From Swiss-Prot:
It comes from Escherichia coli (strain K12). GTP 2 binds at residues 209-216, 256-260, 321-324. Signal peptide: none annotated. Keywords: GTP-binding, Nucleotide-binding, Repeat, Ribosome biogenesis. Changing residue 15 to A: Complements a disruption mutant, KM for GTP 695 uM. This is GTPase Der. PROSITE patterns: G_ENGA. GO terms for biological process: ribosomal large subunit assembly. Transmembrane segments: none annotated. GTPase that plays an essential role in the late steps of ribosome biogenesis. GTPase point mutations (but not a deletion mutant) are suppressed by mild overexpression of RelA, probably due to increased levels of the stringent response mediator (p)ppGpp. 50S subunits assembled in the absence of Der are defective and unable to assemble into 70S ribosomes. GTPase activity is stimulated by YihI. Overexpression rescues an rrmJ deletion, stabilizing the 70S ribosome. The gene is der. The 2 G (guanine nucleotide-binding) domains are essential for activity and function cooperatively. The KH-like domain is required for ribosome recognition.
């Protein structure tokens, strides 16, 4: 088994900074105020070629109420999952009562625990860590995570001895970030191969929406465990959380994202960075579930987020949450509003669910698989050209400057989303209405559902364009005689 290392401690002691340092990413949000990390987050790290899984957790200080209580529960769950615990303290702040409470809990769990004193830059390390020996956790490892000082020594003295006793593991099945990056790279490489099998890869599924529409509740309902902090306050998820799972024999990487709100309401840099990571999660996903609050209806921000999903070319499933408890009259009004405002998204399935009670959730994955299969289906050049020919026979292209636009052949230009490349003459002059006609014709003929389809046009090149033949001496003499004759008859 690959070792699992949990970073625990009070809020704002530098756990996320060390997490980013170990995983060589910026996957954990970092800012100078307590309570920023709310869920436990997994990342892949290695030392001297040996891999381990690092878990970043929310802080525990013993004064939690509301959502902070749930953050503390996530931290305690991370301790149970871990093989090794790095207990981090703040050397600048000194020993705090919360540090003593955490140390007491760690001793009761009998987990291998190592005490790490962070923020020792500018201090005498030996003097700064003296008070922490009273915690009774043995040797103290002073580091400055923000600058990387002492981190390598920590790895060599703490983690490497543990990993030398473990055989390298070839398959990592719990590290979601590893899955996401590895499969994205593998997807990009294998798409160029004829024997590419999209069914062999996990489906990366992002759950997005405005704050407090029930994304994390839906994630937990799907997983069957309280994996993501859920609390009735907008913005309790600030990071994008990658979670591997399996359902009906198919593997998935579930991405629970931070809520995206109106730009004017994004008041601090942390939330702006969370929005960026949400948009990056959409780019990384194969299929996106857009969660909409049935009680609040379609907002401009929902449409803005929908536009980003479409521009990214991602497959889409629309989920209308909080459907329970609504009267039949209100439900009809919501459906009419959806038809009116989302009429241009005719390819996406719409599901009405209650994530809290689980009604309608079981049917979501049928649409997810349908959308993924549509976006990754391989179609040959002969089939695409035949469909294009049928479309032209049913409805001829318009005349452009007195000449009919000629479409010659079509072939696949990419997948996820499906791209059809059409070659012909004067295709750049085709009106948008005819391009939409072709797109809809291909969608109907290929039975593409849940995924956008894109059509690109390539103009046939004239090999003689901008070229002039040089005249032979005989042709030059004829040309001169002709020019004389023309001048003489003027």
């Amino acid at each position: 088994m690959v070792p699992v290392v949990a970073l625990v401690g009070r809020p704002n002691v530098g756990k996320s900074t060390l997490f980013n340092r170990l995983t060589r990413t910026r996957d954990a949000l970092v800012a100078d105020f307590p309570g920023l990390t709310r869920d436990r987050k997994y990342g892949r790290a290695e030392i001297e070629g040996r891999e381990f899984i690092c878990i970043d957790t929310g802080g525990i200080d013993g004064t939690e109420d509301g959502v902070e209580t749930r953050m503390a529960e996530q931290s305690l769950l991370a301790i149970e999952e871990a093989d090794v615990v790095l207990f981090m303290v703040d050397a600048r702040a000194g020993l705090m009562p919360a540090d003593e409470a955490i140390a007491k809990h760690l001793r009761s769990r009998e987990k291998p625990t190592f005490l790490v004193a962070n923020k020792t830059d500018g201090l005498d390390p030996d003097q700064a860590v003296v008070d922490f020996y009273s915690l009774g956790l043995g040797e103290i490892y002073p580091i400055a995570a923000s600058h990387g000082r002492g981190v390598l020594s920590l790895l060599e003295h703490v983690l490497l001895p543990w990993m030398e006793d473990l055989a390298p593991q070839e398959e990592v099945d719990e590290d979601a970030e590893y899955w996401a990056q590895f499969e994205a790279e593998e997807n990009g490489e294998e798409e160029e191969e004829d024997d590419f099998d999209p069914q062999s890869l996990p489906i990366k599924l992002a759950i997005v929406g405005r704050p407090n529409v029930g994304k994390s509740t839906l994630t937990n309902r799907i997983l069957g465990e309280e994996r993501v902090v859920v609390y009735d306050m907008p913005g309790t998820t600030r990071d994008s959380i990658y979670i591997p799972m399996e359902r009906d024999g198919r593997e998935y990487v579930l991405i629970d994202t931070a809520g995206v709100r109106k730009r004017g309401k994004i008041t601090d840099a942390v939330e702006k960075f969370s929005v960026i990571k949400t948009l990056q999660a959409i780019e990384d996903a194969n299929v996106v579930m857009l969660v909409i609050d049935a009680r609040e209806g379609i907002s401009d921000q929902d449409l803005s987020l929908l536009g980003f999903i479409l521009n990214s070319g991602r497959s889409l499933v629309i989920v209308v949450n909080k459907w329970d408890g609504l009267s039949q009259e209100v439900k009809e009004q919501v459906k009419e509003t959806l038809d009116f405002r989302l009429g241009f998204i005719d390819f996406a399935r719409v599901h009405f669910i209650s994530a809290l009670h689980g009604s309608g959730v079981g049917n979501l994955f049928e649409s997810v698989r349908e959308a993924y299969d549509s976006s990754t289906r391989r179609v040959g050049t002969s089939m695409l050209t035949r469909i294009m020919t049928m479309a032209v026979e049913d409805h001829q292209p318009p005349l452009v400057r007195g000449r009919r636009v000629k479409l010659k052949y079509a072939h696949a230009g990419g997948y996820n989303p499906p791209i059809v490349v059409i070659h012909g003459n004067q295709v750049k002059d085709l009106p948008d209405s005819y391009k939409r006609y072709l797109m809809n014709y291909f969608r109907k003929s290929l039975d593409v559902m849940g995924s956008p389809i894109r059509i690109q046009f390539k103009e046939g090149e004239n090999p003689y364009a901008n070229k002039r033949n040089t005249l032979t001496p005989t042709q030059m003499r004829k040309r001169k005689r002709l020019m004389k004759h023309i001048k003489k008859n003027k």
